[in-house]
């Protein structure tokens, strides 16, 4: 498996991405970030892709039921600083990556 540039994805990228994916899932399930208007929405984190230098994490998310997707993605982007703060208490890495939230469109093609 390779990323966009053609460089193979390292084991470290996969491992850190999986740690962040699991931690984000728990944050959303327990609503630990206390994001307004998201308490009633279940959010699925389908994948987290890490950059080569582990400074950027692209989290692909999908709201359960598929309604208000764009609104939820915008809310996650708006509160990414708060999510990152809660994430820093769960994931111990040298540099916590910047979080970029993207809508997972793989469900539409499946």
Regions found by a protein language model. Give the residues of each.
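Charge-rich, low-complexity N-terminal segments
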Residues: 1-56, 62-110
């Amino acid at each position: 498996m390779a990323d966009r540039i053609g460089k193979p994805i390292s084991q470290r990228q996969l491992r850190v991405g999986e740690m962040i994916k699991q931690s984000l899932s728990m944050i959303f399930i327990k609503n630990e970030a206390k994001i307004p208007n998201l308490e009633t929405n279940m959010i699925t984190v389908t994948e987290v892709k890490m950059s080569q230098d582990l400074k950027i994490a692209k989290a692909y998310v999908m709201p359960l039921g598929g309604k208000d997707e764009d609104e939820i993605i915008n809310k996650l982007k708006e509160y990414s600083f708060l999510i990152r703060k809660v994430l820093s208490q769960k994931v111990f890495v040298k540099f916590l990556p910047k979080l970029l939230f993207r809508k997972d469109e793989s469900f539409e093609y499946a």
